[in-house]
């Protein structure tokens, strides 16, 4: 399939060619050329050398400035600006048909989250393997005090309300023993729920939807995550603009000096051209050296390796920490199971275990049905199961610290990410720039060209 040439590059090239042709036509025209030559000859024929010497420093400033702008446009604004033009935002793009901009990461938070989830589930973690690290007895012992209180209240309230004759007809000692037995068996209920969950976690947890939803609803967390993971690379991008800009500026200075001396009328387009080149190339080179080469290469005794890939161990540690802090933690996992894609399946899992628990707590199901009737028994059972399920969100938070430690998601992600091949590890940060890097590069070129125009008319015209 033939790759389409990026529209941003095509537009920039057409604009530059059109401007150059217009300028050439104007200078070729007798009147236009005469006006330009008269202007140049009317000025002091000897341009101070310090003005030429400023060119590399201005180029360094352009390189730094365009790179800073590129980074700002990557992360901000979090929402489309201006807001009144949001209706015209191109779907899946950071820009709008009528203008405006939204940071690349905020505009594609969902897509980037999908890429990272695919990386995690295919290369780093198996969610079923992770959940097998839970110990049902330990989980139950932590949550049991909360569940005992709930169980006592549920049984006393429901049986007294739904079967008052049966309940009040029982001796007080029997009632207390029945409630005590239910409370004692609540730990077993929790163990059964966790054991069932460990076996069927694929059916009740949609990890990708969870992470993508969290990313879309918390764009600031996604931005902060990428900023912290790639902090040193972003500093490199900013500073490299100075170094590369200065180097390109030295070439620009030499070329412009001779052109200005021998064909001064050509200077009007030369500085904007070099400005475009500096802005374009500093962004281009900075983005390339971060991710290329993926594997270390020796060239003339020097080892070349992508700046980001050199920090694989350090980045893996930071990524794993932030991933658990913002996304893959016990609180979010339970929230997804209870209210997410497969919430009906999770509810069914809890209910079947709660129903077994109720039958055990009652003692003789047959006797109970004979006394209060099968229909009433089922009605009471359904009510109690409903209340047990409704109590889960209030009781389970006490186990989050234990679960986070037992699941060990942070440690697992860190250790396995540190061992990833370079081509896989590169996918952690590169998607931030990959799809829209050409837009950032062209913006750098346009800003550089505008600086070149200002530089020419302020210093040399």
Each model region followed by its residue ranges:
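Helix-loop boundary elements of multi-pass alpha-helical membrane proteins
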Residues: 1-11
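Hydrophobic, aromatic-rich alpha-helical transmembrane segments
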Residues: 4-5, 44-57, 234-238, 242, ...
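Cleavable N-terminal signal peptides of Sec/SRP-targeted secreted and luminal proteins
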Residues: 9-21
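Low-complexity, Pro/Ser/Thr-rich intrinsically disordered segments
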Residues: 19, 24-27, 34-42
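Short hydrophobic alpha-helical membrane-entry/anchor segments
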Residues: 25-29, 67, 71, 258, ...
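Large intracellular
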Residues: 36-230, 265-428
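Transmembrane helix-loop junctions at the membrane interface of multipass transporters and ion channels
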Residues: 39-44, 251-265, 459-460
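Bilayer-spanning, highly hydrophobic alpha-helical transmembrane segments
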Residues: 211, 233-254, 434-458
């Amino acid at each position: 399939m033939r790759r389409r040439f990026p529209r941003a590059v095509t537009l920039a090239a057409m604009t530059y060619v059109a401007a150059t042709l217009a300028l050439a036509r104007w200078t070729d025209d007798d009147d236009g050329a005469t006006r330009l030559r008269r202007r140049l000859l009317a000025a002091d024929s000897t341009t101070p050398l310090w003005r030429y010497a400023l060119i590399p420093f201005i180029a360094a400033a352009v390189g730094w400035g365009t790179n800073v702008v590129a980074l700002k446009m990557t992360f901000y604004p979090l929402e489309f600006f201006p807001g009144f033009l949001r209706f015209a935002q191109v779907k899946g793009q950071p820009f709008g048909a009528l203008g405006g901009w939204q940071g690349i990461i905020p505009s594609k938070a969902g897509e980037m989250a999908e890429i990272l989830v695919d990386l995690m589930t295919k290369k780093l973690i198996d969610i079923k393997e992770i959940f097998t690290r839970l110990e049902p007895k330990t989980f139950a012992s932590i949550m049991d005090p909360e569940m005992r209180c709930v169980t006592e209240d549920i049984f006393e309230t429901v049986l007294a309300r739904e079967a008052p004759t049966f309940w009040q007809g029982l001796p007080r000692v029997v009632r207390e023993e029945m409630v005590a037995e239910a409370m004692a068996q609540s730990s077993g209920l929790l163990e059964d729920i966790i054991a069932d969950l460990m076996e069927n976690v694929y059916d009740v947890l949609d990890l990708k939807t969870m992470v993508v939803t969290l990313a879309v609803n918390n764009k600031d967390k996604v931005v902060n995550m990428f900023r912290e993971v790639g902090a040193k690379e972003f500093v490199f991008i900013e500073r490299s603009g100075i170094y590369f800009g200065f180097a390109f500026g030295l070439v620009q200075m030499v070329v412009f000096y001779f052109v200005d001396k021998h064909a001064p009328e050509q200077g009007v387009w030369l500085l904007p051209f070099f400005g475009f080149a500096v802005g374009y190339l500093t962004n281009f080179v900075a983005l390339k050296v971060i991710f290329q080469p993926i594997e270390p290469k020796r060239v003339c005794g020097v080892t070349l390796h992508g700046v980001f890939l050199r920090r694989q161990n350090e980045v893996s540690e930071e990524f794993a920490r932030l991933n658990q802090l913002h996304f893959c933690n016990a609180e979010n996992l339970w929230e997804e199971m209870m209210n997410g894609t497969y919430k009906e399946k999770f509810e069914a899992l809890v209910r079947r275990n709660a129903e077994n628990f109720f039958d055990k707590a009652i003692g003789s199901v047959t006797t109970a049905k004979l006394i209060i009737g099968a229909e009433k028994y089922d009605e009471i059972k359904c009510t109690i199961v409903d209340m047990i399920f409704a109590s889960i969100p209030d009781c389970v938070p006490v186990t989050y610290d234990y679960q986070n430690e037992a699941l060990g998601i942070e440690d697992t992600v860190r250790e396995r990410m540190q061992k990833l091949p370079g081509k896989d590890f590169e996918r952690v940060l590169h998607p931030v720039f990959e799809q829209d890097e050409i837009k950032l590069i062209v913006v750098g070129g346009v800003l550089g060209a505008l600086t070149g125009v200002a530089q020419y008319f302020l210093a040399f015209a």
